[in-house]
Amino acid sequence: MKQVRLLPPAPVRAVCALAVAALAGCAQIPRDPIIQQPMTAQPPMPMSMQAPGSIYNPGYAGRPLFEDQRPRNIGDILTIMIAENINATKSSGANTNRQGNTDFSVPTAGFLGGLFAKANMSAAGANKFAATGGASAANTFNGTITVTVTNVLPNGNLVVSGEKQMLINQGNEFVRFSGVVNPNTISGANSVYSTQVADAKIEYSSKGYINEAETMGWLQRFFLNIAPW
């Protein structure tokens, strides 16, 4: 009789632990942020100029003497007033009704008497379909975030992006913003509403065990896709 040699208990437990850890690591599907551009930018170093020996220095890296505080260079900051309120409603309905009736008789030969003297045939059918559907969505997002000018387009528009992180209890909250700002829409308080930003991307996400508990695992997604009910 051939003897089967089993692995020692310790290696078996180690292999099982590694398998469970691998499945646990695959339970959460990583989500890529919708904003892929850099969140900040460093302003270029100004060219060194010889000091003129007066109070006004044209080579000063700050603002000129007669210029407002609106951003216009890479590295300048801007406050975004997030005021998004989107409502959408959709409804649809369909109703169809169709009926049909057919009746005809087939005479037979005379020598076929009894039940076969005359054959009658009739057919009737009806088809009815009624369906209704509706959907509604409402999203509101209010807040403020300060972003950095990461690029200046040839027409003068500013490409901005920024990120705000907040660690609250056991969760890390992220607010990311990016878009293209027209300098003419910037107020004197160095702020602009998000509704006036082109190509705006606003992302609010979190990391932590609460977010992981609210995320469906990959195995659940698999059975959800193949389940016929």
Curated annotation (Swiss-Prot):
Keyword Signal (UniProt): yes
Lipidation (S-diacylglycerol cysteine): 26
Record's keyword terms, sorted: Bacterial flagellum, Cell outer membrane, Lipoprotein, Membrane, Palmitate, Signal
Record-level Gene Ontology MF annotations: cytoskeletal motor activity
InterPro entries: Flag_Lring
Lipid-bearing positions (N-palmitoyl cysteine): 26
Principal subcellular localization: membrane
Compartments (UniProt record): Cell outer membrane; Bacterial flagellum basal body
Name of this protein: Flagellar L-ring protein
Organism: Burkholderia ambifaria (strain ATCC BAA-244 / DSM 16087 / CCUG 44356 / LMG 19182 / AMMD)
